[in-house]
Amino acid sequence: PLELSSAASDVYKRQLVYPTGLIGTGIFVYILFNFSLLGDMIINGYFFIMSIYGWYYWSRKKDDVFINNVSRLENKEYTQLILLALGSLIFIYFVYVQFDKWNSWTAYVDNITTAIFFVAMWLMARRKIESWIFWIIGDLITVPLYFYKGLTISSLQYIIFTVLAILGYISWKKILLKTNHQ
């Protein structure tokens, strides 16, 4: 429930996403560790840190007006995005090897989704509309992974996350269109 309220807050650009996200990620880290999904466990630790950063970033004001609005990626940010994705792929690979868990196709898939979610959260904290595309892709890959690992309820939760991410993209697209016409 906390993760769902956090995702719904993202859709509507509300800062409630951050406190609910902090609690939800802490609980989910424990669950993911027990199911040997180390990449997803680490990504939730990253979500925790990025939630603190995003809370600060989203709440910044100048003269009682929020200064960080929804925007698109700029060309210079694509390099950062690629480096973040590659860095997370390499880091999570080494975590799996260190714990001797790089032994199943699920480790490969978990590594890929972790990289996708690292990028999605970074973009979300920066209020970039492209974050929703990464959330949608990552969620769609995670649904069958969690179902296969026996995390049926979490799999269903990611179906809901996918719907919320689609709604988030639509909502933020409307905001962008509105701000570009003013």
PLM regions: where:
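Hydrophobic, membrane-inserted alpha-helices
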Residues: 4-6, 23-29, 115-120, 137-144
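Juxtamembrane helix-capping/reentrant segments at transmembrane boundaries
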Residues: 66-80
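Hydrophobic core of alpha-helical transmembrane segments in multi-pass integral membrane proteins
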Residues: 5, 78-96, 162-165
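Alpha-helical transmembrane segments in multipass membrane proteins, preferentially the mid-helix core
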Residues: 91-99, 111-128
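Single conserved hydrophobic/aromatic residue that forms the stacking wall/gate
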Residues: 1-8, 12
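Membrane-water interface of transmembrane alpha-helices
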Residues: 46-63
